[in-house]
């Protein structure tokens, strides 16, 4: 049984989150949680919360056994960018893009 959890509009760029997502794709959830716990990146905290949510969803909604679960799919899509202005010298201004991402984790007992 596949169970899904999402974090939409996560305040980190998709490029940065994908580095962490690639570490746990296809792993057992216990091993994936250990990897995320000791990964020293902001994105690891975001992905870990989504993974824990997917595990809880599988246990509560589908009655799955946590020991059998693995990360079947994990993907990160770009979310909307917040546009900000940064003043520069001589009356100019630069545009700053504060990027967001949508993190999706699918756990499965197969």
UniProtKB/Swiss-Prot annotation:
GO terms for cellular component: cytosolic large ribosomal subunit
Keyword Ribosomal protein: yes
Signal peptide (from-to): none
Species the sequence originates in: Klebsiella pneumoniae subsp. pneumoniae (strain ATCC 700721 / MGH 78578)
Family to which the UniProt record says this protein belongs: Belongs to the universal ribosomal protein uL22 family.
NCBIfam families in the record: rplV_bact
Classification via PROSITE patterns: RIBOSOMAL_L22
Recorded GO MF terms: rRNA binding; structural constituent of ribosome
Keywords: Ribonucleoprotein, Ribosomal protein, RNA-binding, rRNA-binding
Protein name: Large ribosomal subunit protein uL22
Keyword Glycoprotein listed: no
Family matches, as InterPro entries: Ribosomal_uL22, Ribosomal_uL22_bac/chlpt-type, Ribosomal_uL22_bac/org-type, Ribosomal_uL22_CS, Ribosomal_uL22_sf
One GO process term, biological-process aspect: translation
Subunit structure: Part of the 50S ribosomal subunit.
Known function: This protein binds specifically to 23S rRNA; its binding is stimulated by other ribosomal proteins, e.g. L4, L17, and L20. It is important during the early stages of 50S assembly. It makes multiple contacts with different domains of the 23S rRNA in the assembled 50S subunit and ribosome. The globular domain of the protein is located near the polypeptide exit tunnel on the outside of the subunit, while an extended beta-hairpin is found that lines the wall of the exit tunnel in the center of the 70S ribosome.
Membrane-spanning intervals of the chain: none
């Amino acid at each position: 049984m596949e169970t899904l959890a999402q974090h939409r509009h996560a305040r980190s760029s998709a490029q940065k989150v994908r580095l962490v997502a690639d570490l746990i794709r296809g792993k057992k959830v216990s091993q994936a949680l250990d990897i995320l716990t000791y990964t020293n990146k902001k994105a690891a905290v975001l992905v870990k919360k989504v993974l824990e949510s997917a595990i809880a969803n599988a246990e509560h909604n589908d009655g799955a056994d946590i020991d059998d679960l693995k990360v079947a799919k994990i993907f990160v899509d770009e979310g909307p960018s917040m546009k900000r202005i940064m003043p520069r010298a001589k009356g100019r201004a630069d545009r700053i893009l504060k990027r967001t991402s949508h993190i999706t984790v699918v756990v499965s007992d197969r």
